[in-house]
Amino acid sequence: NYYDLDGNLVDNVRKDLKGKYNTYLYTDKSVELVQNHDQTKPFFLYLAYTAPHIPHEVPEEDADRFASHILGKRRNYAAMVSVMDEGVGKIADALTNNGMMENTIIVFTSDNGAYYKSVGSNYPLRGGKGSFLEGGVRGVTFVHSPLLQKSGYTNTNLHHVTDWYATFQKLAGDKP
């Protein structure tokens, strides 16, 4: 049985998806949403992949791609990152093929540093997920859009996702 946050029984659980790798499911659904979008209306897609997260589980055929050069748990981690990267690429291709990329902002970010007790590394930073040290709170981000006035540079300043709101408003034609 499955229950929502209020304790109510959820009847419409997709049992036919049992055993499917959720990174593939999230990507396929996102591509479907892009392909079926009415382009006369605004479009917002928030995709929160669970990869690469503990437990480091991935279909065996994906992990096997790294078998010759990555050992142990890092093989699954590498495969998870690779499948996620390919998924982002498929979504970007769908946006391009549907004429939406020229008016799109893509933000890719993480919520914390790597968990140092597993396969991650934040070297040369100290700490990791769950700590307030820089290795725990610093994450990677990229922003891609033809709408940006300045591109192709690296910003190492401290920022938070809430700092972007005014920029996104301006790019959307609204006043911050």
For each feature predicted by the language model, list its residue ranges.
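Alpha-helix capping and helix-loop boundary segments enriched in small/acidic/polar residues
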Residues: 17, 21, 72-82, 116, ...
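Formylglycine-dependent
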Residues: 1-43, 49-58
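Metal-dependent active-site segment of extracytoplasmic phospho-/sulfohydrolases and closely related
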Residues: 43, 48-49, 83-120
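Ser/Thr-centric signal marking residues that sit
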Residues: 23, 27, 50, 104, ...
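A long, amphipathic alpha-helix that forms part
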Residues: 21, 25-37, 63-104
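Substrate-binding rim/cap in mid-to-C-terminal beta-strand-loop elements of soluble/periplasmic
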Residues: 1-11, 89-97, 123-176
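Active-site-proximal beta-strand/loop segments in catalytic clefts of secreted hydrolases
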Residues: 48-51, 59, 109-112, 144-147
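Aromatic- and acidic-residue-enriched segments that line the glycan-binding/catalytic groove
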Residues: 53-69, 121-122
